[in-house]
């Protein structure tokens, strides 16, 4: 049986043998494409090649592109093939081969490479596209296996842009998956028998956005083959979740709960097990999305794509609760196995930390929610749906947990009413955001040429005329509130070429309004976002924030110097895959087989600083793109998108670097002042991201903060050692006054101290306890020993030793940290689990164990008096 990794490689190898250039999977986070929240298909990263905006590196391309779609999240785990994260296998022709070759390639791959049975293959085609039908017949396929589709099913059209008919390849898995036959395909009925494995789109026409179609001069092939579906067929798995892409993750989840995932239940369809299987699938699917998205640079917040990640983590977390998982944080433990099951590289420690932090935050949310609901349940036996929705919307408390808690308390809630509140909220949200932005984009589409001039290279202040003033509803004469404008000339740089937009303000009638954002439309006009009161008939005074611009220039110029040094230090193969320059820091993405060593990073940093100290003047010039190449200017595809090829702008730091660039730059390298690399992240297969800062002030502050953190880390280890060995002493004896050199010295001492701590722990495996000085309490039926100052590193061992020493003793130990307390309960005579549950009446505890020893966690403050009160009943 072929593994998923082997299947993916067979796809790439096959099309490489057909002269296709392999492109690595791009980041899930789109670059310079505001229309997408995520990369959601194989062709999404190639759109500019198909539109002619950019020249493709080859007319034939093959890839396996990781993608995310979250528009139908409720179906995940319920259907056999629905995922939020998936891979799309693609082969593309940009003005090269067309239908005949594309279908011949498809036949050869499915029959000769995948070895699928010819008689089990079915094909759909657009009913007017008889050419495609004839090609399938000429390739030797059964006419009864060719099914004519409608415009709805077999014509790819997404509004403005290239479109055309498509043909789909289906694989028949047999009647055990559905006794109904080919009518399932003919009537387009959702089923698990006929699995679509390949969709081939023939980009033949251009839609002008008003459903007027003209034939394209260059016809293209855009295909997408479902990787997970192909793997499930070749591994004879009932669903995609029963393949080696998901099962290792599911088996890892099983270790966190006493529930089991049963593959065979697909056919047995036992209701309780079906629900359990669904829970496993949801967690596995969502965490694949989360791990890979965070690995590509996504975060967790309440805004944009980061909110999607928060939603997926929280949905997976509450699903884990439904599986009976009691750990305060558990999802982060899946990160290594997720990485192993795929081919995408990232920093697992960073990804796991982001997930764990969100889990702990959500755990507190759940605890707070419980307390609020407890009060509501005490008031009434029926809870208003508005309260349920408020818990969900304001506090992020899952409605499923509210429902379970209500059931336990015998309280009624109306889920139908809750659903009404939720739908009303979604409609309001969509009308405010989605529809509004769509209208803005549609308005900009009506501006069919460049009408403005950017003068920000030469001046930071202008008096400008308003050419267009509008908001999310319509064109305006007067703006009151948030809206957009385009000027005849502007000093504000728009976000492009990796550089963030300028900050500043516009002034009219003595009133100043802050510039919130500046971006470019399709004709490179500068669109300004502002909130205020503006009259389109009056001129605007425009003022760029000079300090902010200077910081942007520092970081952008430092990016160019970094690029030069990377080529010198790592190799001429280094190219710029992406950059982001804002007023606070810069990032630079580049390919490399291995992560640069610490020593190499130090050398890169050193060489950039040397160039800064040379005090080299910046020079601008304008040339044709061909002349720029002759001059040896570095040209990135990212920059050519924003420039006229007959008049490109070149930024030069003499004898160091010449780059084609439309951004703004510092007049002399000495104004950058300093340069510090603050992190190097692995962003995917062979792609690394350097983050750096500039200026003496920021570098000094970073170094001081980093040094202070290292000292704190060092002192914490020393304290741990001293708890075990009170006579241990350590004092820093620095050899240098330089803060960065001192950091190195502290880092080296931390490594040595960690080894010392391991030795100390080993010598204390049998914890020494002075049994003679212990003080016991007799309360109710318990003889109890309580110690709320136990060492967290030995607390479990202490509990076990005391239990073995005293047969009739109840031992309660706690180790109090800043934000949480570790609790250990041990006893031979008393049931530790029962005591743990008693304490839950006073404390929000998580954890578990057995009758003789339980360990748990709480964020509540634990006191001896309260423990005794609980034991006394």
Curated annotation (Swiss-Prot):
<dbReference type="InterPro" id="IPR023033">
    <property type="entry name" value="Ala_tRNA_ligase_euk/bac"/>
</dbReference>
<keyword id="KW-0648">Protein biosynthesis</keyword>
<feature type="binding site">
    <location>
        <position position="665"/>
    </location>
    <ligand>
        <name>Zn(2+)</name>
    </ligand>
</feature>
<dbReference type="GO" id="GO:0005524">
    <property type="term" value="F:ATP binding"/>
</dbReference>
<dbReference type="InterPro" id="IPR045864">
    <property type="entry name" value="aa-tRNA-synth_II/BPL/LPL"/>
</dbReference>
<dbReference type="GO" id="GO:0000049">
    <property type="term" value="F:tRNA binding"/>
</dbReference>
<feature type="binding site">
    <location>
        <position position="556"/>
    </location>
    <ligand>
        <name>Zn(2+)</name>
    </ligand>
</feature>
<dbReference type="GO" id="GO:0002161">
    <property type="term" value="F:aminoacyl-tRNA deacylase activity"/>
</dbReference>
<dbReference type="InterPro" id="IPR002318">
    <property type="entry name" value="Ala-tRNA-lgiase_IIc"/>
</dbReference>
<keyword id="KW-0479">Metal-binding</keyword>
<keyword id="KW-0862">Zinc</keyword>
<comment type="function">
    <text>Catalyzes the attachment of alanine to tRNA(Ala) in a two-step reaction: alanine is first activated by ATP to form Ala-AMP and then transferred to the acceptor end of tRNA(Ala). Also edits incorrectly charged Ser-tRNA(Ala) and Gly-tRNA(Ala) via its editing domain.</text>
</comment>
<keyword id="KW-0547">Nucleotide-binding</keyword>
<dbReference type="InterPro" id="IPR018165">
    <property type="entry name" value="Ala-tRNA-synth_IIc_core"/>
</dbReference>
<keyword id="KW-0067">ATP-binding</keyword>
<dbReference type="GO" id="GO:0006419">
    <property type="term" value="P:alanyl-tRNA aminoacylation"/>
</dbReference>
<keyword id="KW-0436">Ligase</keyword>
<dbReference type="GO" id="GO:0004813">
    <property type="term" value="F:alanine-tRNA ligase activity"/>
</dbReference>
<feature type="binding site">
    <location>
        <position position="560"/>
    </location>
    <ligand>
        <name>Zn(2+)</name>
    </ligand>
</feature>
<dbReference type="InterPro" id="IPR012947">
    <property type="entry name" value="tRNA_SAD"/>
</dbReference>
<dbReference type="Pfam" id="PF01411">
    <property type="entry name" value="tRNA-synt_2c"/>
</dbReference>
<feature type="binding site">
    <location>
        <position position="661"/>
    </location>
    <ligand>
        <name>Zn(2+)</name>
    </ligand>
</feature>
<dbReference type="InterPro" id="IPR018162">
    <property type="entry name" value="Ala-tRNA-ligase_IIc_anticod-bd"/>
</dbReference>
<dbReference type="InterPro" id="IPR018164">
    <property type="entry name" value="Ala-tRNA-synth_IIc_N"/>
</dbReference>
<keyword id="KW-0820">tRNA-binding</keyword>
<keyword id="KW-0963">Cytoplasm</keyword>
<dbReference type="GO" id="GO:0005829">
    <property type="term" value="C:cytosol"/>
</dbReference>
<dbReference type="Pfam" id="PF07973">
    <property type="entry name" value="tRNA_SAD"/>
</dbReference>
<comment type="similarity">
    <text>Belongs to the class-II aminoacyl-tRNA synthetase family.</text>
</comment>
<dbReference type="InterPro" id="IPR009000">
    <property type="entry name" value="Transl_B-barrel_sf"/>
</dbReference>
<keyword id="KW-0030">Aminoacyl-tRNA synthetase</keyword>
<protein>
    <recommendedName>
        <fullName>Alanine--tRNA ligase</fullName>
        <ecNumber>6.1.1.7</ecNumber>
    </recommendedName>
</protein>
<dbReference type="GO" id="GO:0008270">
    <property type="term" value="F:zinc ion binding"/>
</dbReference>
<dbReference type="InterPro" id="IPR050058">
    <property type="entry name" value="Ala-tRNA_ligase"/>
</dbReference>
<keyword id="KW-0694">RNA-binding</keyword>
<dbReference type="InterPro" id="IPR018163">
    <property type="entry name" value="Thr/Ala-tRNA-synth_IIc_edit"/>
</dbReference>
